[in-house]
């Protein structure tokens, strides 16, 4: 069996932009190594989860690793908790959370929260400059100072402004059938999706429609709202945030919750499902949690270097680690972050850095007669909309036994002319494994 390098470039896809003469950041970026792979292989385009679904990364990663998220997904919170090493038992409620900046506001109708006073969101990510050290210190302060009525919690900062929250009630199990307090994300059934339009204010958590009479959902919403109020009081008074404000920075004074889950999914291992023994290189807790639940090996790789240094080190480690596995799942966060900020120039530079500092050294040392390289994205992240979209993402598969299909560049438009055609996310892995087996 030929070795598999399955590389996911987070948020790579995008919309054509007027500022780029109708092209996307990927189409503008100088990517000679990705273009070479595309020219030597087969290309196609992928709807990762479904038409009309702007997926969050968790459900998209499920899909592109070959697992139907409609069947297996139980919420992003449990996945991130597993990735962060926090236990989630059945009946606990685990959330993915963001540190955010808010201001108190008085409301009088017209709000999604009615007349109840609440919080206007100033920045959902604290200006993206909350250090991991600050976030960990704030989380520890909340853990020490917040006391809940007949309940307990575990709050842990993970990377930057991100974290996880696990709530546990002494009065009975909690249900995940509750709304997000983060207005940027909604639900389609059990799946978390990015919303195009929303009020920029914290949402009071309530049971999802149809679950208003469920005691577990009512208990979960009440407990979440209690925790949000009490944690705000601690964070807003924190000396860490006072210091940030004195430095002209935004305070991380609120925690936005989303994508709760009340149990961890039970998955058939990747090896049992598809055959290959896979290892992974990932940056974020959600991908780490998914990989662990699928039984993948975790390659210890640095995530705290400057991007170019990290890409070069990852390429070096991938060439070493592949000797112990049939394939590697490599997830690179780079392009997603500037797209959320609406910065198409930074997204272009990120893509170019990945091409020059990850793919260049990888391909220089890789024998493509004995290996396959597949490159795609988990979702599109639109610079214009600053959010995930349901837009298809390009896919290339190049290497051993793969003939060229006449496509000579890697990009959203070119991929539509490729021999692979239009695939759904869960179709990628069976095709890739089949090609690897020759």
Language model feature labels by segment:
Residues 1-438:
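Feature captures the catalytic ectodomains and active-site-proximal regions of enzymes
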């Amino acid at each position: 069996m030929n070795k598999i390098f399955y590389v996911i470039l987070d948020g790579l896809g995008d919309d054509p932009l007027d500022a780029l003469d109708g092209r996307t950041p990927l189409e503008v970026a100088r990517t000679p190594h990705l273009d070479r792979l595309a020219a030597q292989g087969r290309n196609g385009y992928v709807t990762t989860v479904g038409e009309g679904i702007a997926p969050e990364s968790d459900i998209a990663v499920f899909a592109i690793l070959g697992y139907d998220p409609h069947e297996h997904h139980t919420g992003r919170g449990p996945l991130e908790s597993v990735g962060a090493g926090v236990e989630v038992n059945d009946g606990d409620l685990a959330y993915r959370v963001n540190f955010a900046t808010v201001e108190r506001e008085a409301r009088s109708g017209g709000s999604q929260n009615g007349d109840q006073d609440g919080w206007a969101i100033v920045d959902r990510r604290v200006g993206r400059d909350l250090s991991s050290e600050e976030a960990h210190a704030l989380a520890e302060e909340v853990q020490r100072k917040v006391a809940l009525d007949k309940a307990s919690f575990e709050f842990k900062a993970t990377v930057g402004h991100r974290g996880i929250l696990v709530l546990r009630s002494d009065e009975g199990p909690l249900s995940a059938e509750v709304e997000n307090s983060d207005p940027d994300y909604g639900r389609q059934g059990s799946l978390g999706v990015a919303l195009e339009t929303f009020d920029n204010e914290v949402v009071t958590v309530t049971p999802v429609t149809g679950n208003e009479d469920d005691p577990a959902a009512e208990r979960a919403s009440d407990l979440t709202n209690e925790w949000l109020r009490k944690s705000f009081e601690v964070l807003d008074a924190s000396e860490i945030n006072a210091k940030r404000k004195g430095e002209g920075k935004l305070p991380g004074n609120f925690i936005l919750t989303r994508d709760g889950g009340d149990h961890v999914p039970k998955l058939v291992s990747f090896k049992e499902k598809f055959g290959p023994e896979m290892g992974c290189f990932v940056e974020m807790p959600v991908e780490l949690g998914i990989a662990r639940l699928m039984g993948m090996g975790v390659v210890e790789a640095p995530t705290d270097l400057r991007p170019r240094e990290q890409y070069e080190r990852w390429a070096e480690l991938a060439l070493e680690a592949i000797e112990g596995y049939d394939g590697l799942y490599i997830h690179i966060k780079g392009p997603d972050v500037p797209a959320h900020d609406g910065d198409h120039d930074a997204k272009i530079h990120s893509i170019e850095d990945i091409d020059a500092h990850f793919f260049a050294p990888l391909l220089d040392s890789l024998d493509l007669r004995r290996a396959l390289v597949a490159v795609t994205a988990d979702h599109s992240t639109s610079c214009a909309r600053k959010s995930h979209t349901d837009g298809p993402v390009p896919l290339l598969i190049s290497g051993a036994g793969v003939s060229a299909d006449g496509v000579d560049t890697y990009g959203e438009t070119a991929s539509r002319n490729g021999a692979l055609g239009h695939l759904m996310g869960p179709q990628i892995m069976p095709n890739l494994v089949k090609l690897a087996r020759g």
